[in-house]
A protein has these predicted regions:
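Conserved catalytic core of the tyrosine transesterase superfamily
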Residues: 1-236
Length: 236
């Protein structure tokens, strides 16, 4: 709406000089909640498109796609992801966890891992073990997402952002790791998770921070509602 209104304002401003009346002169542009706009920047469909388009033809590309899976299925902050080592990838009975040691609260957190992410992590670990002739124990002290296995230095924030930005270019969007965190939170809200569940999943200390995802859900639901056809029944 704002785009159309802006175009009309520009058009009529030029026509005013010819004595024509400007019908949109005093109409103000709608205020846009930039926070909500940022939250809705990346959808689960966008993630699927990136996965389908991303060509895995090297060790780094294998690492990068595993990063995307991890960001989406855990909602991790960048710092939490970059400090992960293979020793933090744990199995208890039939369940897998990440031990997060660099959380915003300063406390260790055990985060359950979705089965789809477990599959991707297992594939990635086996790939590295095969490529470098290592066993599981050899990888324990290695960063999961390093510059290279031999160097064993964690990726920098700048490198992580560049990786996600390059992926975003595949779908014509300028995105960041935090946009992926927004995407999973919004998806959880749309799937029926309540505000406390989303707060705990994301590691928020206050539900006020989480409320933006509930508001985002309302906007998406309204958009869906607007697509419903009208049903006009004749009154008897």
């Amino acid at each position: 709406v704002n785009t159309i209104l802006s175009a009309l304002k520009s058009l009529y401003k030029e026509l005013e000089s010819n004595g024509l009346k400007n019908p949109v002169k005093y109409i103000k542009l709608f205020k846009v909640n930039r926070n909500i706009e940022n939250v809705l920047k990346v959808s689960i469909d966008d993630i699927r498109k990136i996965i389908g388009l991303y060509k895995i033809d090297s060790e780094k590309k294998y690492r990068n796609i595993t990063i995307l899976y991890t960001l989406f299925y855990t909602g991790m902050r960048s710092k939490e992801l970059l400090t992960l080592q293979f020793k933090h990838y744990l199995k208890r009975e039939d369940e897998y966890f990440f031990k997060l040691v660099e959380t915003k609260s300063g406390k260790d957190v055990y985060k359950p891992i979705h089965k789809s992410l477990v599959k991707k992590l297992e594939e990635y670990r086996k790939y590295l073990m095969s490529m470098y002739s290592l066993d599981i124990k050899d990888l324990d002290e290695h960063y999961i997402f390093s510059t290279s296995v031999l160097d064993n230095s964690p990726l920098s924030y700048r490198s992580l952002n560049a990786i996600i930005q390059d992926m975003g270019k595949l779908i014509g969007k300028d995105i960041s790791p935090h946009n992926i965190r927004h995407a999973i939170a919004t998806e959880l809200s749309l799937s029926g998770a309540d505000i406390l569940e989303i707060r705990d999943f994301l590691g928020h200390s206050d539900t006020k921070v989480t409320e933006v995802y509930i508001n985002a859900r309302s906007i998406l639901e309204k958009k869906v509602l607007e697509k419903l056809p009208e049903i006009n029944l004749d009154e008897e």
